[in-house]
């Protein structure tokens, strides 16, 4: 099959829109004699004049050859062997072109996919036509093997190949089809819609971890409400999140209201805002009978300090925090949340319950701002309608408290006495203290007598 090729003059994608680190990888691959294409959703989003979440690269170089080219490269994955080329905190993903893998005997699901192939074979093993577009750095052309350009113009999500077969190979693709259509404002083509309804029960064969990961992506994409509504309409939600399916079926709007608030925040803050899994889990509480407002108002126990502080001062009650963790982990839910995320949410609730109080002393407010999860708890309160003036006041409290906080300094590796490591640990100093002045340490003198542990 001859691909459709759009020359540089026939499309709007420019190198200036591509991440500089991704360009470096593309040019280095080309300079070493390999093909280097920008692939997948990055090409799609740039053609739609949207900001890509990431820039993925396809190449005919093997993972080992890529690793030899880049010292900062790490090979990861089992099902897919991928190369992560690191530039500080940024990662550029490089994948070798693959051809379609066959499922293991007696199974319809492809569990390993490391059979290398050509660019054309790689395009046809991808999920949707709009995700199978390649941008060639050699001549700046866009290569389309599957009809993705036509579907992009028609605002259509179409499966590559037979939808029945492709959804049986990887049932999570059904969730992805719904999520992509909702995020881009596209329609799923009729054949794929019918296939999803026919094979929706196959989703239970997928890893629960992959399903949960897809839900996290949906919650982060800025169109979570619409996506959950469509998952419910297509019948998928009954299998992946039965509690939410039942809530929506009986007309409970709690979940949709929390997702509306989340989407509004994502659109206001942009795609760069990072939300932890714990914050995302909080938006799934309403179908479980736990309104978000309950978790963040008055669940922690107020307990005065016993020292010289005023009557409005408090600390988080460890027993209360422990109770929150127990409540959270005993929730009957079909999604396998990581315990660390559930415990993080419990601590967020304990901190967040104080944010609506108006009787706290300045000292108590300052102490609260020192809590590890204060910023996340404040963020969650902001997402769900906390008064902007109150949010601003709490941020001012946190900034002032941080400015007045004791500073940690580290002495030189080799101090004046010439003994490296004698100042291996930082010292906590009060504001205005001189770091050069060290406290005098006295050695305790041991009384004369027999060695410890010896018989007398």
Predicted regions and their residues:
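Catalytic cores of the polymerase beta-like nucleotidyltransferase superfamily
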Residues: 1-456
């Amino acid at each position: 099959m001859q691909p459709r090729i759009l020359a540089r003059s026939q499309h709007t994608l420019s190198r200036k829109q591509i991440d500089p680190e991704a360009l470096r990888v593309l040019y280095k691959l080309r300079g070493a004699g390999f093909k280097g294409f920008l692939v997948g959703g990055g090409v799609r989003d740039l053609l739609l004049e949207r900001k890509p979440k990431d820039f993925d690269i396809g190449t005919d170089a093997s993972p080992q050859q890529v690793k030899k080219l880049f010292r900062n490269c790490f090979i990861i994955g089992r099902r897919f062997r991928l190369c992560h080329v690191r530039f500080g905190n940024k990662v550029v993903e490089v994948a070798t072109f693959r051809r379609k893998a066959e499922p293991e005997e007696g199974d319809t699901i492809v569990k390993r996919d490391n059979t290398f192939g050509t660019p054309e074979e790689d395009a046809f093993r991808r999920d949707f036509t709009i995700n199978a577009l390649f941008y060639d750095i050699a001549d700046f052309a866009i290569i389309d093997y599957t009809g993705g350009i036509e579907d992009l113009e028609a605002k259509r999500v179409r499966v590559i190949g037979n939808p029945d077969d492709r959804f049986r190979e990887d049932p999570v693709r059904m969730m992805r089809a719904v999520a992509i259509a909702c995020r881009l404002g596209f329609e799923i083509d009729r054949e794929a819609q019918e296939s999803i309804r026919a094979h929706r029960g196959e989703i239970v064969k997928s890893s629960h971890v992959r399903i949960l990961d897809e839900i996290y992506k949906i919650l982060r994409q800025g169109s979570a409400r619409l996506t959950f509504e469509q998952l419910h309409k297509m019948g998928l939600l009954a299998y992946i999140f039965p509690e939410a399916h039942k809530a929506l079926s009986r007309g409970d709007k709690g979940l949709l209201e929390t997702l509306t608030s989340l989407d509004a925040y994502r659109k206001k803050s942009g795609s760069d805002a990072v939300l932890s899994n714990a914050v995302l889990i909080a938006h799934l509480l309403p179908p479980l009978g736990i309104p978000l407002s309950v978790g963040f108002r008055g669940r922690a126990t107020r307990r005065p300090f016993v020292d010289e502080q005023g009557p409005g001062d408090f600390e988080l009650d460890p027993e209360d925090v422990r109770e929150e963790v127990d409540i959270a982990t005993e929730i009957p839910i079909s999604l396998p949340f990581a315990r660390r995320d559930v415990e993080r949410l419990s601590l967020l609730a304990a901190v967040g319950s104080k944010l609506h109080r108006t009787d706290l002393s300045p000292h108590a407010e300052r102490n609260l701002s020192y809590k590890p999860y204060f910023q996340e708890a404040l963020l969650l309160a902001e997402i769900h309608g906390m008064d902007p003036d109150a949010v601003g006041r709490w941020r001012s409290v946190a900034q002032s408290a941080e400015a007045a906080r004791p500073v940690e300094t580290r002495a030189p590796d080799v101090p004046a006495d010439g003994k490296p490591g004698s100042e291996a640990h930082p010292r906590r100093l009060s504001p205005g203290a001189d770091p050069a002045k060290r406290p005098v340490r006295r050695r305790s003198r041991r009384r004369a007598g027999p060695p410890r542990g010896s018989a007398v």
